[in-house]
Amino acid sequence: MNKIFAAFKPRGLSSNAFLSTLKKKYKNKKAGYSGTLDPFAKGVLIVAFGQYTKLFRFLKKTPKTYKATLWLGVYSLSLDDQNIKEIKNIKEFDLANLQQIIDQMQGIISYTPPQFSAKRINGTRAYELAKKGIEANLKPCQMEVFDCKILSYNHPFLNIEITVSEGAYIRSYCELFARKLGINATLSSLERIKEGKFVYNNEKSLNVLKYINLKPNFIKDLNKLENGAKIFVEELKFHDEGDYYIETEKYFSIINIKENTVKYLLNKVEKC
């Protein structure tokens, strides 16, 4: 079964554990997901079955939009509502001051991922090491903040909606935001509501060709695709270098054009 859809991962489960429940639900062992969510987070997770598991690298998965609640005055080792070491009653902030910092934190931001994150260190998730008291050597990264708005502020809780690039960590954004206020802060909730064009819709099966980040190309002799025969660049409508998809009624293929040579990246993928 080929299927791609947006699932809703609940809080408290790792992305792998959640995928296992979907494998059982749909009785399909060949499954995968893209865009790992930490156990603390909930929300949209892109899931694929069958041949569609090979398509993740072609999907347009940015920007990503989250809803987050910042708990001001709280110090947590994991930057969430676990591993809390200190809670301070701090003075309420002026909303205009908070908005000013939100506005300052637009564009490219440098950060170090939190120890309790899904980053892999030699094959092991950083949060698994952190649970054992092992500090991972996490390299500095960059994220881009496209937009951020305050939804509500009921001190000490600040609710925001933020749209970011792939690879961004909202907990790190929270940490940097708090630093500008001169306080500690942590997240009390985090939900991904959108990943690229993917939004949760009751696990409805999607037309993958509307979600891949590729241009269509065309060939007169579609039998070549059906048979996996060699394709020459002169037979195609578009000759510019790059990746394309070509579809027939039942199948599609993904090709690459480079130096006037056509190469199959994926061939004869059955439409769902």
From Swiss-Prot:
Per UniProt, which keywords does this protein have? Isomerase, tRNA processing
Q: Which family does the similarity line name?
A: Belongs to the pseudouridine synthase TruB family. Type 1 subfamily.
Extract the SUPFAM superfamilies matched here: Pseudouridine synthase
UniProt GO BP:
mRNA pseudouridine synthesis; tRNA pseudouridine synthesis
Enzyme active site: D38 (nucleophile)
The EC number(s) this enzyme carries: 5.4.99.25
Q: What does this protein do?
A: Responsible for synthesis of pseudouridine from uracil-55 in the psi GC loop of transfer RNAs.
Q: Indicate whether Isomerase appears among the record's keywords.
A: yes
For this UniProt entry, the molecular function terms from Gene Ontology, in alphabetical order, are: RNA binding; tRNA pseudouridine(55) synthase activity
Q: Which reaction equation describes what this protein catalyses?
A: uridine(55) in tRNA = pseudouridine(55) in tRNA
Give the signal peptide as a residue range, or say none if absent.
none
What broad taxonomic lineage does this protein's source fall under? Bacteria, Pseudomonadati, Campylobacterota, Epsilonproteobacteria, Campylobacterales
What is the protein's name according to its record? tRNA pseudouridine synthase B
Pfam families from the UniProt entry: TruB_N
In terms of superkingdom, the source organism counts as Bacteria
